[in-house]
Amino acid sequence: MTHQTHAYHMVNPSPWPLTGALSALLMTSGLTMWFHFNSMILLMLGLTTNMLTMYQWWRDIIRESTFQGHHTPVVQKGLRYGMILFIISEVLFFTGFFWAFYHSSLAPTPELGGCWPPTGIHPLDPLEVPLLNTSVLLASGVSITWAHHSLMEGHRNHMLQALFITIALGVYFTLLQASEYYEAPFTISDGVYGSTFFVATGFHGLHVIIGTTFLIVCFFRQLKFHFTSSHHFGFEAAAWYWHFVDVVWLFLYVSIYWWGS
């Protein structure tokens, strides 16, 4: 490594942003192909390239931070600001879905029967699976906070147990959501109700899967002693993201499931 007189991390040229962007293009194109032509080839190719990109990009970041010592306090501060800005951009992303929902539901057009839910739509009972999902995510918020405090206090085994519980709850939430979609009495093509419901809850479900993946990486890193009580931004970022996913679900539950039904 060449000598440098500053604390910043000059990242080496990396192919992963490009392969990540191309895999995202393949996935979105593949999703369209699946919807319209019932072909999953492009979607599977996109998912495979996305998984490979994620694995290698995470591997490089772990090498730079844990083994090469590039993540100085100054670099960590920059990463913190970056994560905060990313979460703010995600808030604005979901604001669009809530806007679409309230725009349609607060002043239903005559085509919808002048009422909400629209005529012919039988909404899901908010006191059944959605309420269970809410309690599952709230419990996972408690367990990840337990994991964070255990890590800061140096209780390695407690941290692993709490993180495992959080991951298990995240997987359970995803399975419950999938079963709810499978049994729902309406589809994404059932007018504005179906499209706003499935797009908003579907993107939230995607974020839960991303957050769970993030936590699984942290779990394996903790098994390999990568985190210390004072140097663990990878886990901290995952925890922030998970709390964001929690809060979005509370808004979805109150707006779409409870008030919207």
Curated annotation (Swiss-Prot):
* Catalytic reactions on record: 4 Fe(II)-[cytochrome c] + O2 + 8 H(+)(in) = 4 Fe(III)-[cytochrome c] + 2 H2O + 4 H(+)(out)
Statement: the UniProt record of this protein carries the keyword Translocase: yes
Topological type in the membrane: Multi-pass membrane protein
Question: What keywords are annotated for this sequence in UniProt?
Answer: Membrane, Mitochondrion, Mitochondrion inner membrane, Translocase, Transmembrane, Transmembrane helix
Q: What does this protein do?
A: Component of the cytochrome c oxidase, the last enzyme in the mitochondrial electron transport chain which drives oxidative phosphorylation. The respiratory chain contains 3 multisubunit complexes succinate dehydrogenase (complex II, CII), ubiquinol-cytochrome c oxidoreductase (cytochrome b-c1 complex, complex III, CIII) and cytochrome c oxidase (complex IV, CIV), that cooperate to transfer electrons derived from NADH and succinate to molecular oxygen, creating an electrochemical gradient over the inner membrane that drives transmembrane transport and the ATP synthase.
Protein name from the UniProt record: Cytochrome c oxidase subunit 3
Which residues face the membrane's Mitochondrial intermembrane side?
35-40, 106-128, 184-190, 257-261
Transmembrane intervals: 16-34, 41-66, 73-105, 129-152, 156-183, 191-223, 233-256
Is this entry keyworded Mitochondrion?
yes
Q: Which GO terms describe its biological process?
A: mitochondrial electron transport, cytochrome c to oxygen; respiratory chain complex IV assembly
CDD domains in alphabetical order? Cyt_c_Oxidase_III (cd01665)
Quote the InterPro entries the UniProt record gives.
Cyt_c/ubiquinol_Oxase_su3 (IPR024791), Cyt_c_oxase_su3_dom (IPR033945), Cyt_c_oxidase-like_su3 (IPR000298), Cyt_c_oxidase_su3-like_sf (IPR035973), Cyt_c_oxidase_su3_a-hlx (IPR013833)
* Binding partners and assembly: Component of the cytochrome c oxidase (complex IV, CIV), a multisubunit enzyme composed of 14 subunits. The complex is composed of a catalytic core of 3 subunits MT-CO1, MT-CO2 and MT-CO3, encoded in the mitochondrial DNA, and 11 supernumerary subunits COX4I, COX5A, COX5B, COX6A, COX6B, COX6C, COX7A, COX7B, COX7C, COX8 and NDUFA4, which are encoded in the nuclear genome.
Origin organism of this chain? Answer: Tragelaphus spekii (Sitatunga)
Predominant subcellular localization, coarse grouping: mitochondrion
The disulfide bridges present are none
Q: State which Enzyme Commission number(s) the record gives.
A: 7.1.1.9
